[in-house]
Amino acid sequence: MTELTHLFKPGRLGRYPTRNMIKYGACCVSNYNTRDGFITPRELARVRVIAGTGCGIITNQGAYPDPKGEGKSYFRQVALYDDKFLPQFETIARYIHDAGSVAIQQILHAGRYGGIDLGYCVQPSVVPQTLPHFRPPREMSKDDIRRCIREHVEAAKRAIKAGFDGVEVTSFMGYLLASFNSKFTNQRTDEYGGSLENRGRFMRELIDGVKQALPEHPLIVRLNGAELMDQWGGNTEDECFELMEQAARAGVDQISVTVGWQEAPESSIGRDIAPGHWNYLATRAKKTCPGTQIAFGNRLPDPDMANDCIGRGEFDVWEVCRPLLADPQLIHKAAEGRLDEVRRCIGSLNCLSRLFRDLPYSCTMNPALGHEVEPEYAITPAAVKKKIMVIGAGPAGMEYAITAAKRGHAVTVYEKGERIGGNLYAFAAHDLARPEDLMSVVRHYEVMAKKLGVEMKFNTEANAKLMRSVLHQYDVCVVASGARIDMEAYAGIDGRERLLDALDVAHGRVQAGKRVVVIGGGKIGLVLAESLRKNGAEVTLVERDKRIAGDVMPTFKWRHTTWVEELGIPVHTSARLKRVTAEGAFIVDGKGKETLLPADSVIAAGPRKANQELFTEFEWMVDELHGCGDALMPRGMDAAIHGGYRLGVRI
Amino acid sequence: MVAGWQSVLDRHAELFSEIEEEASLAIVPRRFVAPVCDPVPMLLWVREPDGMAARTGQFGGFKALSSDLLLIANDGTLEQALSGNEPLAEIKRQLRAGGMLFMVLRRKDELREHGWEDFLEWLGMPFLGACR
């Protein structure tokens, strides 16, 4: 049983008792719905999983409140400006109540980031966008402001009519409420702009409007503890907390403390931010607004840590979302003392990378997310229990192995190395952000393999000889042998025998010198170059393409380019290797100019080639032969995990 | 100052090679930036037939500005950038450090049509944001 007594003590939100101090935060719009704002079966199936997470309070994702769609920020965001949307909201409220939780509906008017289907967005003042993704601004008139408040109130009433217990208005990340509060975007000279009191007027009128209409129902506001926009003329932290006081005085039932704007020059929730980094903002909110419940969860993915914070009185409610995308059973596992089984959110922000390309969100760690409506993605008992051999203990092989084992198959994994993880292990060892996040993937597979009885055979190379030795013992063979650096791609290069293989260097099988040239500015080359440079080597990066980081997750590209600059790694783009000598690497740029890059080690970090030879070798030696992950097509960890899972639920 | 930036633009011609003729980027000191203001001198990077040209112009507020992009600099930041070895890299650094601010005066599709994609990508603008 749990020792997380603070997290699992009963609580209260307004007049509603809650079974614990955990709130499912509406951190992400799913983009699973129709273009005109109706909730789809896909969304309903997803929300059913959310309802089952065990959180005491569950917030349904933000709906835009206006018929014009000025508040709409995401391609397939849900709407709440008309009763025609209510039937599906009623279903969602019922799911949440059936699961024993308090149901909150978020109202999300994106303001500066809205108007996705329009040619403009609305703001308190015309302050041009700083990110090209968003629409050019129009200033709201006083009539617009009054109408906007009315639309929020009507949307709130509609949510209650659908069966929700309360509503939340979000100013997260620079949405409309935030842009009224901030002096960066609010440069009005009327009663809605200027002083902090005036800038907070929109928020107070909004709170007052909703509270007057729905006095019996809890109202939550999400407010920035830090905008991270102060260098550009935004609010200071002191101003953010004064606005929180205004909200508390206006009678909100809970303040959810958030961090940062979309366009802030710093990151706030990615892998490079240490868990607990922003806790001081929650602590300050609690001190500033002692009579108001404070919810917090930014970059606080760990239930143990959240439990301790609540115990110390730093905040009242742990607001969590992304960790529950990665593992919807997180709360139940925490309650049952099974935290070692949790599949951790690794902060890759695949979810957001996809949202900003108008795609439905997905999760690196949870391949079933967004596919709950499809029975094909469910783990069900296998009709025929099989003996299965898996070649390779990287993410694809292990994901397949544990999925198959959950279905009742007997699984044995053959791994030529001495541990689980494959190239991910080497990648994590050199990662400058937070190696612990990537290592948590490896640890998860280690724990689950043990618990599920997956047999691991390390230091065992899979080849025809091995296969002959186990002939007819297995029904299925899954080749998840990963990918390698394609050294044959350098066949025409003089001195190619001097090249080092990036994976050999990353795994520590080969030592690089003190002056290094890395050929290939994709993620393998970047991670290795950054790590070698950080450890004191002089490193130069050479990339054929116009830009580096072509295969890196969009939300992490900036991080690599910044590291490369900060570490002082010279980069030669649109350049290719011509020859390697004892002096170093000779490269040729796009104009044909040859340059010597002095080096004692020249490392080939690309291109990659799938390890597919075993498919041919094993073709006539086993009943079923399948493949997954980089062995099919070198892509990356997400594709490997998702591919392993999809094969696992199918065979 | 103009000659200095011209030399920088010439050195990085490949970043601006796709930009449409007459498309421009304006650079203005932060203290002057307002929707409308009395005309003050500004620096312009304008695409001409032979490449990107550095020029001076008059800034009367961003409402009337015909440029696609506006770079706002704290006092001294631009001069500091120009005096270093890599002025464009310094601009990129200052954008992240808060010494400069970038404003987008056209829609994304218009910027793409005008050929700014390479430059914006190089600056890392599509990937900025705290939500990461």
What do the predicted segments below correspond to?
Chain B
Residues 1-132:
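Feature captures hydrophobic
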